[in-house]
């Protein structure tokens, strides 16, 4: 079973992601939040296999949260799932420790495929 944590400030998107991810019987969403600070605390406790992280959130953004998530859960894969489409942003988040960068324009099925790819390769 692959445990996934969702960190995005849009509740409707988190709901859709949960539905798409849990269509795969090997994937399970173990937690979610719209607040990066709460996310870091819960990720440290839950130690999920994968975190889906948005960059643009109120308070602490995903770019600030990324290294803190890495410290709190070093064995967790982080997929940044963001509306920023600039190549520079993708390069920056990968440089800061994300395992993958997916634009929100991609299909939600692509997110599920990426989760699977990451967890198979580990």
Predicted regions, residues:
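Conserved sequence signature across two-component system core domains
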Residues: 7-8, 33, 51
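Short hydrophobic/Thr-rich beta-strand motif most characteristic of the beta2 strand and flanking loop
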Residues: 26-34, 42
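Receiver (REC) domain active-site loop signature in two-component systems and cognate sites
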Residues: 57
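Acidic catalytic/metal-coordinating carboxylates
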Residues: 35-38, 61-64
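Conserved acidic segment of CheY-like receiver
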Residues: 1-12, 17-21
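Active-site beta3 strand of CheY-like receiver
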Residues: 46-52
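Alpha4 helix (beta4-alpha4-beta5 surface) of REC/receiver domains from two-component response regulators
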Residues: 64, 85-102, 106, 112-113
């Amino acid at each position: 079973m692959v445990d996934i944590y969702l960190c995005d400030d849009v509740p409707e998107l988190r709901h859709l992601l949960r539905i798409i991810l849990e269509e795969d019987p090997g994937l399970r969403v173990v937690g979610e939040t719209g607040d990066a600070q709460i996310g870091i605390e819960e990720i440290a406790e839950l130690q999920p296999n994968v975190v889906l992280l948005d960059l643009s959130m109120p308070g602490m953004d995903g770019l600030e949260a990324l290294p803190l998530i890495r410290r709190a859960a070093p064995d967790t894969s982080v997929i940044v799932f963001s509306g920023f489409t600039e190549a520079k942003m993708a390069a920056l988040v990968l440089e800061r420790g994300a395992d993958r960068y997916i634009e929100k324009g991609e299909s939600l099925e692509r997110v599920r495929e990426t989760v699977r790819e990451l967890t198979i390769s580990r």
